[in-house]
């Protein structure tokens, strides 16, 4: 009888050991699966971060993939110069050379067909080049905070000669700079440091936000993107609303949401390069009238960081991991994402009882 009990006990012990082993393996597998949600207001750089993940973790864009972005580069370039020329009328800025008015008419006559066909014909590129060289156009570009303009406008317009070549193939940097409004949800998968990442990029404009909700379940971490350089801009969809204020409002609702009590929140204060250039001539008081510090990068950026971090109502239990980023700079994003991954690994192991 004793032998039978002993055999049963042994079998039960083996089963228990196997269950423990399976639970541990499941725990380790769960710890290796990372679901990242990219959130933030429109034009904060979320899609650029996704493109960087492809460049850093998936061997980048092939020549054929780059070629497919050519029409987007052309469209962004045409849309940018058109936005500047249209704004000249509203801001009552004249062309320095009166003959540029003919070029402006040509621009509007040729642009529609060019965009539809995804091309940049030589006559149109010459028109754009002459317009961009005009002092009146440059004066209007200098006042771009007063109207809606792509961040990549100067990048493409300054490089028009290269872009207009008949054999032009966009570079990785050209692809990073392209702007296409994200509608719906874009999912990206990659592996890094033995972790399997699923990254979800969702549209930031107000009309897109209702599509976020079903992505929330089982999220490991949220990367919330803020355009630092948007402190003196208004929304494309609501010209009464300051973009930074909108971003803060959105961050408040995400950071303090009951869904995300146990979710790591990583704050990317993005477009630091544009902010550093802009802060010298556009004061932070435009956005924060109470600000009394210097209009210098370090002090102003630190102030914005504290404004966002102060929105966290659970400081005793919830930490915000803040990074200053330039989403178009691959080395910077690589460095920051490395640090972010270490935080995720540590928190994941803790949650699975393995740390």
UniProtKB/Swiss-Prot annotation:
Q: Where is the lipid attached (S-palmitoyl cysteine)?
A: 3
- List the Gene3D superfamilies: GI Alpha 1, domain 2-like (1.10.400.10), P-loop containing nucleotide triphosphate hydrolases (3.40.50.300)
Q: Which Pfam families match?
A: G-alpha
Q: G1 motif: where is this region?
A: 35-48
Q: Which domain of life is it from?
A: Eukaryota
Region of interest called G2 motif, as start-end residue ranges on this chain: 174-182
Q: Which residues form the G-alpha domain?
A: 32-355
Q: What segment(s) does the record annotate as region G3 motif?
A: 197-206
A single GO cellular-component term from the record reads: cytosol
Primary localization: cytoplasm
Compartment(s): Cytoplasm; Cytoplasm, Cytoskeleton, Microtubule organizing center, Centrosome; Cell membrane; Membrane
As for membrane topology, the entry says: Lipid-anchor
GO molecular function terms listed in the Swiss-Prot or TrEMBL record = G protein-coupled receptor binding; G-protein beta/gamma-subunit complex binding; GTP binding; GTPase activity; metal ion binding
- Please give the subunit comment from the record: G proteins are composed of 3 units; alpha, beta and gamma. The alpha chain contains the guanine nucleotide binding site. In this context, interacts with GNB2. Interacts with UNC5B. Interacts with GPSM1. Interacts with RGS12 and RGS14. Interacts (inactive GDP-bound form) with NUCB1 (via GBA motif); the interaction leads to activation of GNAI3. Interacts (inactive GDP-bound form) with CCDC88C/DAPLE (via GBA motif). Interacts (inactive GDP-bound form) with CCDC8A/GIV (via GBA motif). Interacts with CXCR1 and CXCR2.
Q: Briefly, what is this protein's role? A: Guanine nucleotide-binding proteins (G proteins) are involved as modulators or transducers in various transmembrane signaling systems. The G(i) proteins are involved in hormonal regulation of adenylate cyclase: they inhibit the cyclase in response to beta-adrenergic stimuli. May play a role in cell division.
Give the family from UniProt. Belongs to the G-alpha family. G(i/o/t/z) subfamily.
* Name under which the protein is recorded: Guanine nucleotide-binding protein G(i) subunit alpha-2
Q: What is the protein's species of origin?
A: Canis lupus familiaris (Dog)
Q: What is the lineage of its organism?
A: Eukaryota, Metazoa, Chordata, Craniata, Vertebrata
């Amino acid at each position: 009888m004793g032998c039978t009990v002993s055999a049963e006990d042994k079998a039960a012990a083996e089963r228990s050991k196997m269950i423990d082993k399976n639970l541990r393996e499941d725990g380790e597998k769960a710890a290796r699966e990372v679901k990242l949600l990219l959130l933030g207001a429109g034009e904060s750089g979320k899609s650029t971060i996704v493109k960087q993940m492809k460049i850093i973790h998936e061997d980048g864009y092939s020549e054929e993939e780059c070629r497919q972005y050519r029409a987007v580069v052309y469209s962004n370039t045409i849309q940018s110069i058109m936005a500047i020329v249209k704004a000249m009328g509203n801001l009552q800025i004249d062309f320095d050379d009166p003959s540029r008015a003919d070029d402006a008419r040509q621009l509007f006559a040729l642009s529609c067909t060019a965009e539809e066909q995804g091309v940049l014909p030589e006559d149109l590129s010459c028109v754009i080049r002459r317009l961009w060289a005009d002092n009146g156009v440059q004066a209007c570009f200098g006042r771009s905070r007063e109207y809606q303009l792509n961040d990549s406008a100067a990048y493409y317009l300054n490089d028009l000669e290269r872009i207009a070549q008949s054999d032009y193939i966009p570079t990785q940097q050209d692809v990073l700079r392209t702007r296409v409004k994200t509608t719906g949800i874009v999912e990206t998968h990659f592996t890094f440091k033995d972790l399997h990442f699923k990254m979800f990029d969702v549209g930031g404009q107000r009309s897109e936000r209702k599509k976020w909700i079903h992505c929330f379940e089982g999220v490991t971490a949220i990367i919330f993107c803020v355009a630092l350089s948007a402190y003196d801009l208004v929304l494309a969809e609501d010209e009464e609303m300051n973009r930074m204020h909108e971003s803060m409002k959105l961050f408040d609702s995400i950071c303090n949401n009951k869904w995300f009590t146990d979710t790591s929140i990583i704050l990317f204060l993005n477009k630091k390069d544009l902010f550093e250039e802009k802060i010298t001539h556009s004061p932070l008081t435009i956005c924060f009238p109470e600000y009394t510090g210097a209009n210098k990068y370090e002090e102003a950026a630190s102030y914005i960081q504290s404004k966002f971090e102060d929105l966290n109502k659970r400081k005793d239990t919830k930490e915000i991991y803040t990074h200053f980023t330039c989403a178009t700079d691959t080395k910077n994003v690589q460095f920051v994402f490395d640090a972010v991954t270490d935080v995720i690994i540590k928190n994941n192991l803790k949650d699975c009882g393995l740390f």
